[in-house]
């Protein structure tokens, strides 16, 4: 609403209706305000045409927006599908499936061979060293089995040697590391030597104690014609000391010489006893000198 400027409604007082828009307009006209005229038919048509064009534009934009939304939804679905394919690609890939097929075919072939040769496998398991795989005559099978056993042990030793050789080839440490590794070996050898010497001394002491015990028992026994043989048997049957594990040729020679010395000592003691007995006999048979003089 504007004052003046439009004289169309000037002097025309709108019909006053109580409580309506016309009442307000009439009051405004009384106050001197000019009321805008109602739009004409042309204006209404132009306004409708402009509104129609705007509505068409809005509809077109909405359609384009719906198309874009559909495309976005399709892209989201495709992206999710590609993510799922990436997660299961190692399971559904053509190359992986071919590998699995080859593995299954190989396992199937092995199982078929096992089923076909089950009797032979059972027989070989029951006889681990059967020689049906190598043609050998019956008379040489025992020797061949022993040869195989020896070859197995030699093969184990060869395998250990090969592993040691491989280790020596792969060991590429500097000489300082070699020195650190070889340094404790002399100390260990010295301790082993001392331990061996202590064990040897203890063994000799046990042997000496055993000989003394056997000698005392031999002296306490009465002398009989077969006494020497009995003492020898007793000395031979004595249980060796527990500390002694292995005997060398030197130990055997030492024991032999000791036994010979013991035998000689026993023979000398027997000879002395016989001489004492003879002297006693002569002493009993001889007359005292006083008796001889009286008889004379």
Curated annotation (Swiss-Prot):
InterPro entries in the record: HAUS2
Summary of the function given for this chain in its UniProt record: Contributes to the assembly of the acentrosomal spindle and phragmoplast microtubule arrays as part of the augmin complex.
Keyword Cell division: yes
Gene null: resulting phenotype: Lethal when homozygous.
Organism of origin: Arabidopsis thaliana
Keyword match Mitochondrion: no
Underlying gene: AUG2
Acidic residues biased stretches: 264-277
Keywords, alphabetical: Cell cycle, Cell division, Coiled coil, Microtubule, Mitosis
Residue numbers spanned by region Disordered: 218-296
Similarity-based family: Belongs to the HAUS2 family.
Protein name (database record): AUGMIN subunit 2
Biological processes, Gene Ontology terms: cytokinesis by cell plate formation; microtubule nucleation; microtubule organizing center organization; mitotic cell cycle; spindle assembly
Subunit annotation: Part of the augmin complex composed of 8 subunits. The complex acts on microtubules and interacts with gamma-tubulin in spindles and the phragmoplast.
This protein's GO CC annotations: microtubule
Residues forming coiled coils: 56-83, 253-285
């Amino acid at each position: 609403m504007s004052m003046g400027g439009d004289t169309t409604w000037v002097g025309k007082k709108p019909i006053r209706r109580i409580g309506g828009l016309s009442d307000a307009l009439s009051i405004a006209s009384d106050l001197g305000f000019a009321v805008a005229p109602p739009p004409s038919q042309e204006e209404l048509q132009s306004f409708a045409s402009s509104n129609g064009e705007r509505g068409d534009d809005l509809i077109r934009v909405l359609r384009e927006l719906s198309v874009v939304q559909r495309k976005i939804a399709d892209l989201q679905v495709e992206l999710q599908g590609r993510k799922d394919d990436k997660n299961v690609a190692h399971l559904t890939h053509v190359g992986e499936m071919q590998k699995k097929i080859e593995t299954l075919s190989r396992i199937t072939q092995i199982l078929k061979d096992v089923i076909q040769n089950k009797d032979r496998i059972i027989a070989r398991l029951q006889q681990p060293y059967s020689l049906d795989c190598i043609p050998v005559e019956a008379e040489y099978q025992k020797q061949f089995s022993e040869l195989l056993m020896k070859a197995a042990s030699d093969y184990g030793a060869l395998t250990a040697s090969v592993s040691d050789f491989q280790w020596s080839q792969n060991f590429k440490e500097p000489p300082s590391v070699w020195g650190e590794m070889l340094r404790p070996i002399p100390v260990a050898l010295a301790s082993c030597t001392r331990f061996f010497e202590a064990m040897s001394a203890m063994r000799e002491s046990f042997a000496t104690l055993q000989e003394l015990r056997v000698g005392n028992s031999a002296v306490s026994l009465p002398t009989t014609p077969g006494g020497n043989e009995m003492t020898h048997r007793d000395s031979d049957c004595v249980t060796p000391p527990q500390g002694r594990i292995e005997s060398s040729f030197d130990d055997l020679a030492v024991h032999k010489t000791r036994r010979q010395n013991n035998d000689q000592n026993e023979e000398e003691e027997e000879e002395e006893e016989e001489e004492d007995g003879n002297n006693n006999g002569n002493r009993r048979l001889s007359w005292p000198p006083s008796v001889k003089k009286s008889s004379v």
